[in-house]
């Protein structure tokens, strides 16, 4: 392409290479049953277990990016209306519903666990580490991997997988693509459309496995 622009050659030879353009990556998606197993894996007898369960509930209910979840502050959470105010890429603000289940877990975490984790440290962050500090992306990645292994999910799972599940499961239940785009904070609908391909692929797999002539 550079040589073409500079006038050194007439035609870009890379155009003759089959499938030169990289195909779009289809993300790994957990089934709804697998997602439920992952979310309910934490041991609720400890403050850390309640925190982890709450983080997984909020992540699946809202589809937040990992950075958005870890930077979430209580001043941005409205438990009465069950919504969070999120500042995403480019500092774009959006309002995301939490649903009843995630809201209930946030209340439980706040009332029963958060103060124990804070250890007298003052912080407006919703989720903190076992030392009362801000949790790192790597910390949360290890948490998700730990629970995935615990419930027998061997695939390459990360916190972002749960965001993928959020979008795909909504579309599987006939959510409008534009609404999903808004919830995810995508600036372009083409970014969101990848999930329609994932949903279609899953439907084809189900058909092929269960239909007598599949």
Model regions and ranges:
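Conserved catalytic core of the tyrosine transesterase superfamily
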Residues: 1-214
